[in-house]
UniProtKB/Swiss-Prot annotation:
<feature type="binding site">
    <location>
        <begin position="26"/>
        <end position="34"/>
    </location>
    <ligand>
        <name>GTP</name>
    </ligand>
</feature>
<feature type="domain" description="AIG1-type G">
    <location>
        <begin position="17"/>
        <end position="225"/>
    </location>
</feature>
<comment type="similarity">
    <text>Belongs to the TRAFAC class TrmE-Era-EngA-EngB-Septin-like GTPase superfamily. AIG1/Toc34/Toc159-like paraseptin GTPase family. IAN subfamily.</text>
</comment>
<feature type="region of interest" description="G3">
    <location>
        <begin position="75"/>
        <end position="78"/>
    </location>
</feature>
<dbReference type="Pfam" id="PF04548">
    <property type="entry name" value="AIG1"/>
</dbReference>
<feature type="region of interest" description="G2">
    <location>
        <begin position="53"/>
        <end position="57"/>
    </location>
</feature>
<keyword id="KW-0175">Coiled coil</keyword>
<protein>
    <recommendedName>
        <fullName>Immune-associated nucleotide-binding protein 4</fullName>
    </recommendedName>
</protein>
<feature type="region of interest" description="G5">
    <location>
        <begin position="184"/>
        <end position="186"/>
    </location>
</feature>
<keyword id="KW-0547">Nucleotide-binding</keyword>
<feature type="region of interest" description="G4">
    <location>
        <begin position="145"/>
        <end position="148"/>
    </location>
</feature>
<dbReference type="GO" id="GO:0005783">
    <property type="term" value="C:endoplasmic reticulum"/>
</dbReference>
<feature type="binding site">
    <location>
        <position position="185"/>
    </location>
    <ligand>
        <name>GTP</name>
    </ligand>
</feature>
<dbReference type="InterPro" id="IPR027417">
    <property type="entry name" value="P-loop_NTPase"/>
</dbReference>
<dbReference type="InterPro" id="IPR045058">
    <property type="entry name" value="GIMA/IAN/Toc"/>
</dbReference>
<feature type="region of interest" description="G1">
    <location>
        <begin position="26"/>
        <end position="33"/>
    </location>
</feature>
<keyword id="KW-0342">GTP-binding</keyword>
Amino acid sequence: MAGLEDTTDLRLPSASEPIKNIVLVGRTGNGKSATGNSLIGKQVFRSETRATGVTMKCETCVAVTPCGTGINVIDTPGLFDLSVSAEYLSQEIINCLVLAEDGLHAVVLVLSVRTRISQEEEATLNTLQVIFGSQIIDYLVVLFTGGDELEANNMTLDDYLSKGCPEFLKTVLRLCGGRRILFDNRTTDEGKKVKQVQELLAHVAAIEKSTSGIPFTDEMHRKIQKEAETLREQQKEVESKDLAAAEIEKWKKHYQTEHDKNMNMMAEMLGNRLREDSERQEKMLLALRDNLEISQRQNKLNELTDNEPDLIHCGVSLRRMPCNML
């Protein structure tokens, strides 16, 4: 599993330059892990072509890009797949925020030009807004994988988007200021690898400028930060006391248990919020379906009503005709 332990042979960013926290989200199979590897410049996230996702837990890796920017890339599992339970999603969202304790500098929605954009992509944006609020769009970048396929067909990203771009995607691109980028995760061209990473970091820089350099945090994120700070202070205080090693370990374990309990409570609250939203969405879909059926029945009734006068007129005319003409 990729994680902070995988960064030992990677250059670490200097303390004077804050690390950019970049989280990758999207449907299983869209190439999140491969994109993370492209950003890091090394195979640290497991990436394979299969029906089920390889990444099962949020994973992170810190490195310095060729242009000198320190990044913390967070690879998420298929958090927003329709098959994912609210409990699993809420726990992994909490884990994701723990890995980006100082806030999110960019949320990268990973799509693929190789597959049709589905309801799951649309659900991703809705779920992000349910969890974080509408402000999360200010930090969104839409990244398309499969650049090699478009290049083989002599197509640009704009060519691809001009051919039947779903309304959902048009809305997303409009809301995030058109921040989009095409990635080729299969290229062996070192210059191309560097260029596409630089292009993504340019979008991150643009986000920083538009948000006054303030990374995204919300109430839940701030609670997580406070919990982490409290745990550090408690453990530091225990270590400063003249206690036996076993006693120190006992208190550390106690504080860690309390911390985990509070984190689980937050995950449970988030899970309840997600379930409520899911139920609301289902009710809306049922209402739309019912309204559509009512509308279709009304249209059929109107068609019959429109034809009725002609039938009545014909019947009256026949009754008034002379007998010798019948």
